[in-house]
Amino acid sequence: KKNTKKDFPQDSHEQLWGAISAVFQSWQNQRAKTYRRLNNIPEEWGTAVNIQSMVFGNMGNDCATGVAFTRNPSTGENSFYGEYLINAQGEDVVAGIRTPRNITKKERLESSSEDLSLEETMPEAFAELTKIYKKLETHYRDMQDIEFTIENKKLWMLQTRSGKRTAKASIKIAVDMVSEKLITKDEALLRIDPKILDTLLHPTLDPKAKKNIIAKGLPASPGAATGKVTFNADDAEQMKANNQNTILVRVETSPEDIHGMHAAVGILTCRGGMTSHAAVVARGMGRPCVSGAGVIKIDYAAKLFKVDNAEVKEGDIITIDGSTGEVMLGEVKTINPDISGDFSEMMKWADEVRTLKIRANAETPLDSRTARGFGAEGIGLCRTEHMFFDEERILYVRQMILSKTKEDRLKALDKILPFQRKDFVEIFTIMKGLPVTVRLLDPPLHEFLPKTEKEIDIVAKSLKIHSSEIKNRINYLHEENPMLGHRGCRLAISFPEIYEMQCRAIFEALYELQKQKVEAVIPEIMIPLVATEREIEILRELVDRIAQEIQKKNNFKVDYLVGTMIELPRAALNANNIAKHADFFSFGTNDLTQTTLGISRDDSGKFLDDYVENKIFKIDPFVSIDQDGVGELIKLACSRGLEAKKNIKLGICGEHGGDPDSIDFCHRAGLHYVSCSPYRVPIARLSAAQASIRAKK
């Protein structure tokens, strides 16, 4: 009455239609919109309403209600798993109002609980439930999430559905079901959401690290997380926007907290079980979660929680381990995961099916090792400018930029050459036998110059010049729109000696490896920001000239490719002419998206959400390829490039290279490889396999 200004209806039909209407209206509430956005669910789908007669689990001690999974949703273990409450209604189990009991005796003993399991208190109902869950899983050929009620000792099944599970459990269940001949390998591959693999590829707590454990709850969602304590979902979202990791601490979570749960790196609740809202949502999101930590007493008004004599305030750092249920004060050291077993088996199946090659974007030895460890088949983007920012070499780079004559520039470049050569030797050694795409210098020169007065004075003193010279050079190099300014191949047209030095470093590194009898890589030298045929023609001649010079001088031969990034619409439209001088195209989808849509990636955050909400874009085009615009240019460039050169190699190296939907597009567009960040390589491998399977259907 307070909300509707009407008395509660007494007519049962009016009540029923009111409930049905409420479900339909819930599709447009804020938490539903957030959930759709996070899970890429189309708004036009709508929601269904199920109507069924009621049974009661709260009529006495011979009644109960529960939630069960046909396999463990956290580990994937093939054992019946769940929770129940005596004399309670269904929502009580998941709402976290009371801490529920285990369903099986085995679970109870493992958790050291004194509360008897369903198997012990109601053995007949448990036996019937066991038969039914096995039948349901065999029928649906997937792990089931079951809700049931026991009314006066009689078992009623309320619903069954495919259960949410952790990434680890998803893979184990899929691999086990193939072994059990319930599903095929292709079905197993299609069942894994590639994005959830992220949760398997990040650190866990170092078992040797010192831990100040202040509480222990239920291990609701695996993984470890460290962050600042916050008690409010909105604050968690704001802190994430400020690049702060947070642990969202709540008595219990509800659907209103979903945006904060997504923003937080971990979730801690003091009420609720393994099937509570916090546990289920955290598992689905891949967030570590500890639930049911009853010793924690939260004071929302004072913005703190107490455990015995300890007091933890908002902003204090804690660590949670969702695999053990431990809550610790401060930051605890982590270790990288060991990827093997079921994960390796699944990746092996994916590699057998996919046709797209998977490379990584890497420019340091550490990145290269990580990429190779995750199964990368080469480097699709090695950004050479990142090598310039090292403390040892940035001074020489600045000296080169500040030089007034070509002679002075060459002297500075001679000092940079050994550093670049050393970097390439390391990377080529790690990636031996695989292709490595080296992008020659791309950013505008002003990015390498000092920014503050203090930095300017330090550089001036080091180079023995007046600070005014540096300021004058900074002013001269300043650009209103540097993304479209004097960068990429345009720099090399003005200052060819920069690309000459980089090419020398590449070919001298190859000679070093040949002397050491290291298996050769095939370098793919990539020229960025090409818009015209003449640009690539001039710079191809430069690369070939340096290659011949180094090979002749050292009496050795090496295979190499020269290609370009397609990141401007004009380049895509003129791909047939550009292909005459290129061995490969690599689509730089970050800049191609910016230049096609006329949208700055750095500034788009202010309005892109409005565009998605108003259905102008289905999804952020910097996250997933805009297939109707950017995608059409890519397909056109591929077609025209192949017309001019049948064996031209085609790939992408933008951020989209790790996005499953973009990878599916790349497969359909006929690209040969995608390149992504090292930690997204397994995601790309699985996504490419799924694209291949879908294409066969």
What spans do the regions from the language model cover?
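Extended, highly charged
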Residues: K1-T75, N87, R98-T104, R108-I132, ...
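Hydrophobic alpha-helical scaffolding
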Residues: K6-H13, N40-I41, G57, T75, ...
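Extended active-site and interfacial segments that coordinate phosphate-rich ligands
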Residues: M59-P123, T160-A188, A263-I298, A310, ...
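Conserved catalytic alpha/beta cores of large enzymes that bind or transform nucleotide phosphates
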Residues: K1, S79-T160, T166, K172-K208, ...
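Acidic, glycine-rich flexible loop/linker segments
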Residues: T199, T204, N212, A220-A236, ...
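Generic beta-strand/beta-sheet core signal
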Residues: I51-M54, T65, T70-R71, S79-N87, ...
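Flexible, glycine/threonine-enriched loop-and-boundary segments that flank and lead into catalytic domains
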Residues: R31-A68, A233-D235, N242, I247, ...
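Conserved alpha/beta-domain cores
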Residues: I339-G341, W349-K697
